């Protein structure tokens, strides 16, 4: 059902290269927004100055653009609820903090980590329980004395002593029964923490649905508590719906985190995965279009997607399956699109721009390569023979096989037209005069022409390479 009031957000921190789990989260949010005709908001959570990297910020923007996950509000686009970099929203956070303090929903806390641990030990309370709400009732006189002594407070939110429950769009009912201590909203420097800025930005930007990784589930009760406080002070009038997407597991059944090389988005882009294949596979990490079908387009996903169909169990990343799905989408491209996407990989491989003639040769070979590869880098290696002057071949052959090749050369030199059908007929005719398996001779010729055991079809490769280059390569192979 379409509902333009739906607003979701993708709000990564620019602390490293984008990883696949992050891209999967962006995809599910984008599809959810497009399904409902709502808004997809892109926000950069760059409040932690010690970890932020400008390069990472650019990579996040470039990643979404390359994937075609366009945003309705955010960096490079703006919107009525900006700015969309948290580092530029400090005045908003301070205004909210002032209102929370004035309403006695938050308070100043001066306790140090060491003081909290000491009190817990003296009270026989486990240290891991953390803060003990000690500063809730500090008098103004005590606070003044603390400041006089040079101590700077942090701001904490008052938590009610009650269970927090909500209906998760993926996991169903979730209930938190353990008491949650009053948690920090700021550092002692006054810098706002994630616990404050994330829900505040969602409230100001009128986010209706929060779809994010399951690793953030534990922070949800604190955010719900803050939302209720924001309702009290008039910042918003609702708590958004939450849906926690399953964890993605990698090799060895370990969580696929940003520290794993196999999770780096740029690894897949550089290897020649295409956006259609990568998005298709990432959508399968927690969701499927049907029990009998794994491949589909982005538009088909939008039509079929229901967040309540997302599975709650951990999803396992399978590189081989990702390759197979990418191969399917490579085959689905029209030939010209395949050619255009292949050109940058070929130029990077060769280290030089392709000439007009080289591009024509590449375009001609593409129909014979497209169905044989899983990655654009594989395709680039497969067509290298067309675009270089010399190839290296080290392969042992018998004297009889050399005789066959010489006979092939003699007949090929007599051809009037250099076309694949005539080339094939000529070579087969030469082989028939010798008691050898055609497959073996074809393999030798393939190596002589392309330098590879796996290549585009032999006779079409020879036609596109051209008479002179093809005959020279066979001659070189025979004489060396």
From Swiss-Prot:
It catalyses: tRNA(Glu) + L-glutamate + ATP = L-glutamyl-tRNA(Glu) + AMP + diphosphate. GO terms for molecular function: ATP binding; glutamate-tRNA ligase activity; tRNA binding; zinc ion binding. It comes from the Bacteria. ATP binds at residue 258. The keyword Lipid metabolism does not apply. A motif ('KMSKS' region) lies at residues 255-259. The keyword Kinase does not apply. It is an enzyme of class 6 (ligase). A motif ('HIGH' region) lies at residues 12-22. It is found in: Cytoplasm. Keywords: Aminoacyl-tRNA synthetase, ATP-binding, Cytoplasm, Ligase, Nucleotide-binding, Protein biosynthesis. One of its GO terms (cellular component) is cytosol. Its EC number is 6.1.1.17. InterPro entries: aa-tRNA-synth_I_cd-bd, aa-tRNA-synth_I_codon-bd_sub2, aa_tRNA-synth_I_cd-bd_sf, Glu-tRNA-ligase_bac/mito, Glu-tRNA-synth_I_codon-bd_sub1, Glu/Gln-tRNA-synth, Glu/Gln-tRNA-synth_Ib_cat-dom, Glu_tRNA_lig_a-bdl. One of its GO terms (biological process) is glutamyl-tRNA aminoacylation. Belongs to the class-I aminoacyl-tRNA synthetase family. Glutamate--tRNA ligase type 1 subfamily. Catalyzes the attachment of glutamate to tRNA(Glu) in a two-step reaction: glutamate is first activated by ATP to form Glu-AMP and then transferred to the acceptor end of tRNA(Glu). Monomer. This is Glutamate--tRNA ligase. It comes from Tropheryma whipplei (strain Twist) (Whipple's bacillus). The lineage of its organism: Bacteria, Bacillati, Actinomycetota, Actinomycetes, Micrococcales.
């Amino acid at each position: 059902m379409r509902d333009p009031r739906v607003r979701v957000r993708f709000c990564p921190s620019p602390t490293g290269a984008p990883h696949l789990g992050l891209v999967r989260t962006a995809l599910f949010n984008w599809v959810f927004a497009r399904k409902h005709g709502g808004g997809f908001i892109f926000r950069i959570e760059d409040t932690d100055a010690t970890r932020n990297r400008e390069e990472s910020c650019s990579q996040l923007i470039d990643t979404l653009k390359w994937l075609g996950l366009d945003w309705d509000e955010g960096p490079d686009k703006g919107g009525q609820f900006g700015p969309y970099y948290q580092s530029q929203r400090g005045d908003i956070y301070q205004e909210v903090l002032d209102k929370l303090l004035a309403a006695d929903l938050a308070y100043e806390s001066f306790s140090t980590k060491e003081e909290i641990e000491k009190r817990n030990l003296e009270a026989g309370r486990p240290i891991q329980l953390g803060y003990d709400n000690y500063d809730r009732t500090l008098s103004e006189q005590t606070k003044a004395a603390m400041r006089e002594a040079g101590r700077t407070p942090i701001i904490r939110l008052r938590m009610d002593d009650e269970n927090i429950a909500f209906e998760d769009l993926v996991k169903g009912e979730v209930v938190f029964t353990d008491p949650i201590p009053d948690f920090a909203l700021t550092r002692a420097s006054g810098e706002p923490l994630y616990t404050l800025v994330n829900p505040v930005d969602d409230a100001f930007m009128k986010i209706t649905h929060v779809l994010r990784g399951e690793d953030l589930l534990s922070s949800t009760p604190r955010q719900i508590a803050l939302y209720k406080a924001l309702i009290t002070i008039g910042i918003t009038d609702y708590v958004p719906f939450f849906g926690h997407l399953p964890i993605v597991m990698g090799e060895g059944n370990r969580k696929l985190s940003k520290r794993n090389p196999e999770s780096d988005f740029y690894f897949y882009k550089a290897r020649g995965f295409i956006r259609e294949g990568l998005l298709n596979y990432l959508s399968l990490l927690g969701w499927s279009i049907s029990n009998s079908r794994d491949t589909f387009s982005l538009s088909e996903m939008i039509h079929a997607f229901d967040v309540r169909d997302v599975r709650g169990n951990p999803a396992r990343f399978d590189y081989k399956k990702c390759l197979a799905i990418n191969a399917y989408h490579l085959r689905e491209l029209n030939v010209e699109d395949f050619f255009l996407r292949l050109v940058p990989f070929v130029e990077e491989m060769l280290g030089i721009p392709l000439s007009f003639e080289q591009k024509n040769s590449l375009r001609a070979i593409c129909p014979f390569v497209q169905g044989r590869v899983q990655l654009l880098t594989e395709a680039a290696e497969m067509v290298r023979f067309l675009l270089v002057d010399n190839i290296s071949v080290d392969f042992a052959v018998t004297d009889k096989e050399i005789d066959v090749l010489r006979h092939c050369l003699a007949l090929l030199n007599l051809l009037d037209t250099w076309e694949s059908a005539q080339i094939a007929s000529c070579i087969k005719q030469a082989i028939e005069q010798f008691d050898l398996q055609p497959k073996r001779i074809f393999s030798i010729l393939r190596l002589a022409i392309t330098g590879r055991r796996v290549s585009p079809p032999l006779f079409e490769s020879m036609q596109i390479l051209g008479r002179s280059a093809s005959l020279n390569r066979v001659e070189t192979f025979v004489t060396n």
